[in-house]
């Protein structure tokens, strides 16, 4: 996943009003907050296509429904069909909603959710 692609995803979360940082939360703790990472799929094509999954993990001390509300916002924004854009470099990107699930953890006061987005980037 390119830096430019990560920047596009960051802008999308900002438009949705989702408190987000990449890889680790570095701001003062206020709930809920969301941290993103990604996993790439090896490309066997020569057409410049790179595919991966963007993993958004949400944490709150509120209810699971609070996290589900954010999930619905993300799901409605990206949809299963996805959104597309041409980036400043001329590369293309498509981001769509994939899957999500609650993450059980041992801390009784903390709840988590994982939201997976499908990402495709085409380099020039």
Segment roles from a protein language model:
Residues 1-46, 81-91:
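Small/polar-rich, solvent-exposed N-terminal microdomains that initiate assembly or binding
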Residues 28, 46-48, 104-109:
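Short, ordered beta-strand-loop transition motifs
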Residues 48-62, 111-121:
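Oligomerization/assembly interface segments of phage tail-like spikes and tubes
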Residues 79-124:
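Acidic-leaning, charged glycine-interspersed low-complexity segments
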Residues 51, 59-83:
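Extracellular/virion structural assembly segments
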């Amino acid at each position: 996943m390119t830096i430019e692609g990560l920047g596009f995803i960051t802008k999308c979360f900002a438009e949705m009003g989702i408190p987000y940082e990449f890889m680790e939360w570095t701001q003062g703790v206020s709930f809920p907050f969301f941290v993103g990472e990604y996993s790439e799929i090896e490309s066997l094509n020569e057409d410049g296509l790179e595919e991966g999954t963007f993993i958004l993990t949400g944490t709150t001390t509120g209810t699971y429904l609070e996290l589900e509300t954010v999930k619905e916002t993300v799901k409605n924004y990206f949809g299963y069909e996805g959104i597309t854009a041409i980036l400043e470099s001329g590369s293309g990107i498509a981001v769509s909603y994939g899957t999500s699930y609650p993450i059980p953890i041992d801390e009784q006061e903390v709840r988590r959710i994982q939201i997976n987005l499908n990402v495709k980037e085409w380099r020039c």
